[in-house]
Amino acid sequence: PEFFIQRDMEYFDKAFRQAADGKEEVPLSLIGGALKKMMPKFKVRRYGCKTLGKLYERLDRYELVMTEKGVASAVRLKG
């Protein structure tokens, strides 16, 4: 899975930028939609993760934004 993450990192960054549209926090649903447009066969499990949130959590430059119930709802750049 680590190989695939490194190989496709540019897509994860591009999907974040496209979905962000200038916003700091980006809903995971928008990122997922952008990834599906770029990579129609995108499957989060290929990267060893059960959810898109877990995948972005593994990427060093991003952090998850949690809801009050402790559910990951969005992603933002660290720092």
Language-model features: locations:
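N-terminal regulatory modules in eukaryotic regulatory proteins
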Residues: 1-79
